[in-house]
Amino acid sequence: MTQSEPVVEIVTEADAWQPDPRWRPAARLTVLLGEDDHWQRRPRYHEIVRRARDAGLAGASVWRGMEGYGVTSRIHTTRLLDLAENLPIMVMIVDDAELLREFVSGNAELFDTGTVALSAVQVWSSGAGSRP
């Protein structure tokens, strides 16, 4: 008669995680601009936010950076008064990936400068005020 060896199950933290239905897949559109980027004499970031709202996207936010550089490799910073110009601007919009792709395609003239990135994210939906 042979003795069977005990079965040992190794469970890692990742394996033990149970999906929470309040998390749902979404996408994040990130647009990196310079503060001096304009669209028809208005800040380009303002026009992007206005059109995102008009398109019914879930929400948009704009951040002004402290320091950064772009394609010209010139550093723009708030640390020195004489260089505190054309600071980096980041526009972020989170919604369904296909809606964001359609938004960029339908407003391509707004995205001819800067960097546009689309990333997969998870959005917490607590229920109150959440989109379906």
State each model region's role.
Residues 1-132:
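Positively charged, small/polar-rich N-terminal and surface patches that mediate targeting and assembly
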